[in-house]
Amino acid sequence: MKKISLPKIGIRPVIDGRRMGVRESLEEQTMNMAKATAALLTEKLRHACGAAVECVISDTCIAGMAEAAACEEKFSSQNVGLTITVTPCWCYGSETIDMDPTRPKAIWGFNGTERPGAVYLAAALAAHSQKGIPAFSIYGHDVQDADDTSIPADVEEKLLRFARAGLAVASMKGKSYLSLGGVSMGIAGSIVDHNFFESWLGMKVQAVDMTELRRRIDQQIYDEAELEMALAWADKNFRYGEDENNKQYQRNAEQSRAVLRESLLMAMCIRDMMQGNSKLADIGRVEESLGYNAIAAGFQGQRHWTDQYPNGDTAEAILNSSFDWNGVREPFVVATENDSLNGVAMLMGHQLTGTAQVFADVRTYWSPEAIERVTGHKLDGLAEHGIIHLINSGSAALDGSCKQRDSEGNPTMKPHWEISQQEADACLAATEWCPAIHEYFRGGGYSSRFLTEGGVPFTMTRVNIIKGLGPVLQIAEGWSVELPKDVHDILNKRTNSTWPTTWFAPRLTGKGPFTDVYSVMANWGANHGVLTIGHVGADFITLASMLRIPVCMHNVEETKVYRPSAWAAHGMDIEGQDYRACQNYGPLYKR
């Protein structure tokens, strides 16, 4: 089966069409702007899968309708998913703009005095606004000389932010969310909303009963040689934690081996259902070998599966990590309890950064006073105002231990193409696999247990759906926090010491939901959240605006908020603008 091609970035050099001197004097400068833009993007960006980003430049500069149409024909044939229009001069606004209604688009007007690039930028954006096709504005802060071919830092930042978000939009379009099972324990996020996926993300939902997973395991619809490799890998790399179950619920060695085997099989089969596996065709299972074209998935698990069979913790944790028995590879996006809305936040984070995502319960707010009362320890540093306990038995990626290192030796989570095998091994070594607690998981299983290193910048996100409003996005930038071991042990044992933990301190602003840490917890819209490495809230905001998802809560500096220019016409408060603009334009793929 032919592999679907990755979306490309289209670069549209536009020009003043007046011949006999004007156009001729601008051809080289205009095309060089396009080439410089393409060079920047191909050098600095990758797709989430790790592949190089490709740019497609119009064959000619665009002065009017005919050349715009020729450019569009080229872009349509080469899977261009977003466009950047560049110009150093005046051009004919509505005659030269990109009119595709669902393709993210930006315009860079060169800030120079010899020719009015800024005037075209304003004219073209006015046309976009009047026609209801929002576009992003890029205009350098400082005047450049006409022969200056450099890209200023502020222009570069906007080009890269737009491109990262635009590639995420284009990469999600046409893919599916694999809903493996139904509603888990009444969790609203697992009431999968097909209209949301179709209208806002351009995706389909593939609903599959969990009996399909059972069938694949029972009928051996998997690669048996790979299963043996996975078992050998686990035997080499898994460290097991204590079994905290009562004696009557503890499993013997043979039973534990069967649980491990099925847990690894679940990972293999869920992966095969998402992306397909040509090895299945070799054993006569051609239909199953195709998969469901899923870019993200969720597994219900509780309780209809977990009351009888091993839980999804091991499978989810391995799939969401950047490595397994096949080595370092792109992490999958698999939401525990089929929380599709948290799955979408995971998908956004992965598409923007290429990194694994940490799924967690937003479990407990610990005030400084409560921690001092319980442990005698006084919080300080990043934790001085209190912390939030992020913990869940399920799908936290092992990358979340932060045993990978950046160029300065700091703990982090890297894009998978930068991770060494030694770093993958370090994450495994930092993880223990604890037998599942019987009172929660009667069918057994293994929960990963690790503790996230402190001082690491993270962005916590969540998508919620509000009746009458639609989807909204929450964003909280902050840091992981390291507590003294005895303090961590006391606090962790009050919840469940067999699960992975991140102690999170959001960055406070003194206003609204970021008045204090308690307010962050109180304003969080659901029981789950996602941690994405780095302070990347600005990228999430730009992506959300492309999809027409308003942001209801964030602590990103106002100077970093980057949305389409038409948002400014929707009022004077930038967050109110976001709501009114998203309501005005409606979902990107209106249905």
Curated annotation (Swiss-Prot):
Its main location: cytoplasm. It comes from the Bacteria. Pfam families: Fucose_iso_C, Fucose_iso_N1, Fucose_iso_N2. It is an enzyme of class 5 (isomerase). Its EC number is 5.3.1.25. Pathway: Carbohydrate degradation; L-fucose degradation; L-lactaldehyde and glycerone phosphate from L-fucose: step 1/3. It catalyses: L-fucose = L-fuculose. Coiled coil: none annotated. It is found in: Cytoplasm. GO terms for cellular component: cytoplasm. Keywords: Carbohydrate metabolism, Cytoplasm, Fucose metabolism, Isomerase, Manganese, Metal-binding. The active site is at residues 337, 361. Mn(2+) binds at residues 337, 361, 528. Its cofactor is Mn(2+). GO terms for molecular function: arabinose isomerase activity; L-fucose isomerase activity; manganese ion binding. GO terms for biological process: D-arabinose catabolic process; L-fucose catabolic process. Converts the aldose L-fucose into the corresponding ketose L-fuculose. HAMAP family: Fucose_iso. Homohexamer. Belongs to the L-fucose isomerase family. This is L-fucose isomerase. It comes from Escherichia coli O9:H4 (strain HS). The lineage of its organism: Bacteria, Pseudomonadati, Pseudomonadota, Gammaproteobacteria, Enterobacterales.
